Amino acid sequence: MTTTLPAYDEVVARYEPVIGLETHVELGTNTKMFCGCPTDFGGAPNTRVCPVCLGLPGSLPVANRAAVEATIRIGLALNCSIAEWCRFARKNYYYPDMPKNYQISQYDEPLCVDGYLDVEVDGEPVRISIERVHMEEDTGKTLHVGGATGRIHGATESLVDYNRAGIPLVEIVTKPIPGAGAMAPEVARAYVTELRDVLRSLGVSDVRMEEGSLRCDVNTSLNLPGEQWGTRTETKNVNSLRSVERAVRSEMIRQASVLEGGGRITQETRHFHEDTGDTTSGRSKETATDYRYFPEPDLVPVAPDPTWVAELKAALPELPRLHRRRLQQEWGLSDLDMQSILNAGAVELIEATIAAGATPTAARKWWLGELSRRANEAGVELADIGATPEQVAELQGLVDAGKLTDKLARTVLEHVVAGEGSPAKIMADRNLEVVSDTGALTAAVDEAIAANPAIADKVRGGKVAAAGALVGAVMKTTRGQADAKTVRELILERLGVQG
C-alpha cells in the first residue's frame, strides 16, 4: 500500500466525495433529560447525580418538557416535519461511562424528520437535507490517568464522572451530501457554521464547540464517478469549525491514498488530531443492529399537541439568514462585502461592535483587517482572538477622539489581544496617546526644520511633497505619537507655505 499522500487537487479530479454530518447539541435546560439533577457545569465529580441518571434498580425516568420543547423549536427552525407521535428507544452498549448499560435515545420514531438548512459557499446557495432531529441523553465522562495523550492507551487508571450522564442532547443528522466535489470541506464547515448560528439564535444552547456543547461527527467516503458510493468512515468529536473543514479534506486525501494503493476502506470511527490535521483509526463502526434498539418501556410516547407546535413556530425568532439580509441592507453593503464578512465568521462580532458604538465601516475595518490577520496567523477562529466587540468599539472611539492614530491603535490592539486590559488602560500604561501639546509639537517641527535646511528650502520653493521627509523626522522624534496630518499642517505653516 502506498504511503505517499496525493495532492488534494488530484483526489477531487479522480474521485467524488460524499459527506454527512451528525451533530450533538447539549441543551441549556436547568435539569437533566429524565431526572431533576442540575445541569450546571463545574461540580465536584459524581455530585450532580441521582438514582435515575445512575440507572439504579427501581428508578423511573420522566421526560423533561423543556428539552422536548427545545427539540421541537430546533426542528421547526430546520424546516422539519414534527411527528404527531414519537417514542424513546434504548440503545444498548457497554461502556464505563454508561451507568445503565444503555442510552435512552430515539431510533425509528424520532420527533423531527425531513428538514433542510440552506447555506452559502463562496456566495452560492447549497441546500443540506436533514434526515432527523431526535432527543437523547448524554453519557458520563471517562478520564484516563497516566497516559501521555489522555487516552486509554498507556493509562494506569481510568476514572468516571457521571455528572454529565443524563444531560439533554439533541442529535441532528443530515442525509448524505453528494455532489459537493472539491468544495466538500467548505460545504461541511458552512453547514456547521449555519447550524451553530441557528441554534444560538434559538437560545437552546451556548453551542461552544471547544467546551463540548456542540460536537460534530463527520462521515466521509469516496467513489469513482458513476460508481456506487464508497465505504464511509466517521471522524468523531471534531471540536472547531476550522477542524470540520480540515477533517474532511484530510480524510479524503487519506482514503484516496488507500484506494490508489490497492487497499480497501474500513468502516470505522476515526480521531482527528488538531496538531497534525490527520485522522487515526478508532474502532470498527457499529451498525444499528449492533445496538439492539428496542422501545423504552419506562417512558410513554410523546405526542405534541398541534396547537402547541403552531405556537412554538409562530414564536420563532428572526433566523440567521433573514437577520443577515436585514443587516446587509442596514449597513449598506454589497453582496461581495457581506460575503467577506460571512467568510470571516464576523457577522455577530461586527454587529456587537456597532451596538457598542462603532460605525459599520470602522467595525468592518478592524475585524476584517488587523484582527482577521492575527487570527489567521494564530490558527484560531476570529471570535477566539482575544479582543471583544466592546474593546474594538472603545479602540475606535479613541481614534475618533484624536487620542490615537491608526498606527498607535494597532499597537494598542496588539496588547489588547495579549490580554493586558482595555484600550484606554493600555494607552495610559504604555504612554501611547497622541502628542497633542501644541508647544511640544511646534518645538519638534522647528527642530526638524533646523536639522534639514535643504529640505526646508525645497518646501519653501514650492516642492510641497518634500515635506514628507520633515513629517518623518517629527514622527521619529515623537516616537510615532504625533498625528501625521497635524504635523504636516504645522510644518507648512512654520515654513509659510500653503498646502
From Swiss-Prot:
According to UniProt, the reaction catalysed is:
L-glutamyl-tRNA(Gln) + L-glutamine + ATP + H2O = L-glutaminyl-tRNA(Gln) + L-glutamate + ADP + phosphate + H(+); L-aspartyl-tRNA(Asn) + L-glutamine + ATP + H2O = L-asparaginyl-tRNA(Asn) + L-glutamate + ADP + phosphate + 2 H(+)
For this protein, the record's InterPro entries field holds: Asn/Gln-tRNA_amidoTrfase_suB/E, Asn/Gln-tRNA_Trfase_suB/E_cat, Asn/Gln_amidotransferase, Asn/Gln_tRNA_amidoTrase-B-like, GatB, GatB_Yqey_C_2, Gln-tRNA_amidoTrfase_suB_CS, Gln_synth/guanido_kin_cat_dom
| A Pfam entry, by short name | GatB_Yqey
Fetch the SUPFAM superfamilies from UniProt: GatB/YqeY motif, Glutamine synthetase/guanido kinase
GO molecular function ontology, one term from the record:
asparaginyl-tRNA synthase (glutamine-hydrolyzing) activity
State the EC number(s).
6.3.5.-
Establish whether keyword Nucleotide-binding is in the entry.
yes
The GO annotation for biological process reads: glutaminyl-tRNAGln biosynthesis via transamidation; translation
In terms of superkingdom, the source organism counts as Bacteria
Q: Which UniProt keywords apply?
A: ATP-binding, Ligase, Nucleotide-binding, Protein biosynthesis
Give the matching SMART domains: GatB_Yqey
Which NCBIfam families does the UniProt record give?
Answer: gatB, PRK05477.1-2, PRK05477.1-3, PRK05477.1-4
- Give the UniProt family note: Belongs to the GatB/GatE family. GatB subfamily.
What function is annotated for this protein? Allows the formation of correctly charged Asn-tRNA(Asn) or Gln-tRNA(Gln) through the transamidation of misacylated Asp-tRNA(Asn) or Glu-tRNA(Gln) in organisms which lack either or both of asparaginyl-tRNA or glutaminyl-tRNA synthetases. The reaction takes place in the presence of glutamine and ATP through an activated phospho-Asp-tRNA(Asn) or phospho-Glu-tRNA(Gln).
What does the record note on quaternary structure?
Heterotrimer of A, B and C subunits.
Question: Any idea what this protein is called?
Answer: Aspartyl/glutamyl-tRNA(Asn/Gln) amidotransferase subunit B
